[in-house]
Regions:
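Intrinsic-disorder-associated, low-complexity terminal segments enriched in Asp/Asn/His/Tyr and depleted
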Residues: 6-7
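N-terminal phosphate-binding loop and adjacent alpha-helix
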Residues: 40-79, 103, 109-113
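Short glycine-aspartate micro-motif
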Residues: 15-20, 81-85, 190-194
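Short beta-strand-loop/turn "lid" adjacent to the catalytic site in phosphate-handling enzymes
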Residues: 71-117, 143-155
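Glycine-rich phosphate-binding loop plus the immediately following alpha-helix
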Residues: 117-127, 138, 145, 153, ...
Length: 254
C-alpha cells in the first residue's frame, strides 16, 4: 500500500479503511482512520430475509447495498476510502497473510466448495473498492494452512487432518501478546485458543500454526455450536442406523 498525500500534496494523512465481516445472521462493518475505529455497525438479517435466497452467494448484491446504505446514512463517502478489507472465506488452503482480491480469488470465493457467509466478505469488499477506486483485501481466512506434515496424520490414511481454524483472531491475539511482552511473534512458541460458537486450539511455532483442530467440522473441544470430537464407534453406528442423512449427521457435529 502507498500512503496517501494530503490535499496539499505534502506530508501524509491516515488511511481510511472499511472492514466488512459477513456472518450467518448479520453483516458487521467498521471504519478506521489508521488503527482508530470511527464507526462500528451491526446490520441484522432476519430469517425471513435470508430465506429469500436459495444460496448464500445470492445474497451478495443485497448485503452490499445494505452496507452502502448504512455508510450513506452516516454521511460517509466511499470515495474517501484508502482500502476495503473483508472477512476471508472457505477458499483453497493458503498461508497466513493479507491477500488482494483479484480474479483468481474472486473465482475461489464464488465457487467455494462449502457455503458460508464468510465467502461474501472479499466479494462485497471488492465491489465497494471498485466503486471507490481502491483495492480490496482479505486477511488470514479460516483456511490458513501452515501445518507440519506430522500434524496431518490420522489413524486412517484416507482421513488426513486438515487446517480450518479461527486464524484471523488467533494470529491477531498472538501478535498482540508478542507486542505486549516486547518480542516478535516469529520468535515465540505459543498455544492460542479461540473460544466462541466454535473453539479452536492451536500450536503457534515461530509465527506458524503447526497444529490445530478442524473447528469448522466440530473436531476438538465441545463448543456452543460444535459437538467436539465424539466417540468414533458411536458415530459410525449413528451414521448407519438408517435414521439420519449425511446432512443430518453433519448438522449434529457442527
Amino acid at each position: 500500500l502507498v500512503w496517501p498525500l494530503n490535499n496539499s500534496g505534502i506530508g501524509f494523512m491516515g488511511f481510511k479503511i472499511l472492514a466488512i465481516n459477513p456472518g450467518s445472521t448479520s453483516t458487521k462493518i467498521a471504519l478506521y482512520d489508521d488503527e482508530q475505529p470511527t464507526l462500528a455497525l451491526t446490520l441484522r438479517h432476519s430469517a425471513e430475509e435470508i430465506a429469500r435466497f436459495p444460496r448464500i452467494i445470492d445474497q451478495l448484491d443485497w448485503r452490499k447495498e445494505m452496507v452502502l446504505e448504512a455508510l450513506a446514512k452516516n454521511n460517509f463517502d466511499v470515495k474517501s476510502l484508502s482500502a476495503v478489507i473483508g472477512r476471508g472465506g472457505l477458499i483453497k488452503p493458503i498461508e497466513s497473510g493479507v491477500y488482494e482480491v483479484n480474479a483468481a480469488l474472486k473465482n475461489d470465493l464464488v465457487n467455494a466448495q462449502r457455503e458460508h457467509a464468510s465467502n461474501l466478505g472479499g466479494l462485497i469488499a471488492e465491489q465497494i473498492a471498485q466503486a471507490a477506486g481502491v483495492k480490496a483485501y482479505i486477511a488470514d481466512p479460516v483456511v490458513v494452512d501452515e501445518l507440519d506434515d506430522i500434524a496431518r496424520l490420522s489413524g486412517i490414511p484416507e482421513c488426513p487432518r486438515i487446517s480450518i481454524f479461527h486464524a484471523l483472531n488467533q494470529k491477531a491475539i498472538a501478535r498482540r501478546h508478542a507486542e505486549k511482552v516486547g518480542k516478535r511473534y516469529e520468535d515465540l512458541n505459543l498455544v492460542v485458543a479461540h473460544m466462541g460458537g466454535g473453539i479452536s486450539v492451536s500450536a503457534h511455532c515461530k509465527g506458524r500454526v503447526i497444529d490445530t483442530n478442524n473447528a469448522l467440522d466440530g473436531d476438538g473441544p465441545i463448543a456452543p455450536e460444535r459437538a467436539g470430537t465424539v466417540p468414533a464407534g458411536a458415530l459410525v453406528n449413528l451414521c448407519f442406523s438408517g435414521k439420519y442423512s449425511q446432512r443430518d449427521v453433519l448438522k449434529m457435529l457442527a
